[in-house]
C-alpha cells in the first residue's frame, strides 16, 4: 500500500526552483570532499513526531490523522513502518530514531508489551533490509503515570526496577535493528521542589542506572555510542541534565565520561539560554560531540516548540562545529521536529522535511565556505598569538609560576597596549559575505 501516492521521489532542482516539493540545496548524491551530501549530513526521521504526532497540545485535540488507516494498535504499528519507509525513501533519508513506545504501545503487562515490541522490530528488520538504518533508539520512560516522579531518579525503587527492565528491552531492540546509538533523555529526571527531594540519592541512582545500561549494552554486542541529551526544563521544572557543561560534571563525578557523548538539541540550548553553537562547542572542546537533534525553538517563547529548522545562520554555525569536530561518526542529524498544528495535511510532512533538510544542506555549504575562506580562523589564531611564544608559551608549557609571572609583570609595566580589537562586527560581516555569495 502506498500512503503518499500523490507525491513522488523528491528531486534536487537547485536554488532557482519554485517547486515546493523539490530540494533547492540538498543534493543527496553530490560529492563534496570525498563524500556524498547524504553521507555528510546523515539525516534521520523521528518516529515520534513524524509517525505519531497528531497535533494534540495542552489546549486542543489532534488536527491530523496519524492512524495510518488502522484502528487496531498492532496493525497500526506495522502500518507506521510501511509509511515511515515510504517517507524516508521519497526524501532520500537513510536513518530513523525511535522511542520503544513509538514503535509499539504498552499492553496489559511488561511481558505482553515486550512480546508486541518484538513483533514490530522483527517487521522493521525485515522491511529495512540494507536500505534503511537505525541511527539511535531510546526508552520512553517519561509519559506513563508510573514515571510521574522520574524513572532512574524516582523515589520508588519499584519504578527504578521497572525503568531498568524497559531500558534493557530498548537496548535489545536497538541492537536488533543495528542502531549505532542509544540515548538517555531525562524528561522526568529532575524535581519540582527541593522540599521533597533527595537530590544526592537521585543523582547517585541515575548514575547507577546508566552504568548498568553500559554494562548490559556492551554484553549484548552494542558497539555504538551512548548519548545523553541535555535539557534544562520541561516537563520537569529543573532537569538534572541541564546543559552540556552540567552533564559533563555529572559524567566525570561518576566515572562515566569515557562511556557517553552528547546528543545536542537546538531547542534545548535555547531553553538553557545558550546558543546552539555554544552547546556544540562545549561538546566539541571536551571530546564528547556525538549526535544532533535538528530543530529550532522560538526565542520569544519559554517552551520546547520543536519547529523544523529554517534559520540558516544557526544551521551554518552548527555545521561549522560539526566539520571542526571531524564530522559525524555514529551520530547524525535527527529531525526532532514537528509540523505546526495548523499544518495538518500529508503533504506538510514533506514540506517540513524539505525545509529542514535544505536549511542544513545550505548551512553545510556555507560552513565549508567559511572554513575554506579562512578569515575567521586566521583572525582567531592571530588574536591568541601571544600564547605561541615568550611568556605565553612558558605558561602553557608549565614553566611559569606566580613568582615568575609577578617578576614579568613588574618589568613589563602596563599591558593594556597588548590588547587588540575583538572586531565582532567585522566577523559578523564576513559571515554575511560568505552566506550571501554562495
UniProtKB/Swiss-Prot annotation:
PROSITE patterns: XYLOSE_ISOMERASE. One of its GO terms (molecular function) is xylose isomerase activity. InterPro entries: Xyl_isomerase-like_sf, Xylose_isom_bac, Xylose_isomerase. It catalyses: alpha-D-xylose = alpha-D-xylulofuranose. Binds 2 magnesium ions per subunit. The keyword Acyltransferase does not apply. Mg(2+) 1 binds at residues 229, 265, 293, 336. It comes from the Bacteria. Its cofactor is Mg(2+). GO terms for biological process: D-xylose metabolic process. Keywords: Carbohydrate metabolism, Cytoplasm, Isomerase, Magnesium, Metal-binding, Xylose metabolism. Mg(2+) 2 binds at residues 265, 268, 304, 306. HAMAP family: Xylose_isom_A (MF_00455). Disulfide bonds: none annotated. Belongs to the xylose isomerase family. This is Xylose isomerase. Its EC number is 5.3.1.5. Homotetramer. GO terms for cellular component: cytoplasm. It is found in: Cytoplasm. The keyword Ion transport does not apply. It is an enzyme of class 5 (isomerase). The active site is at 99, 102.
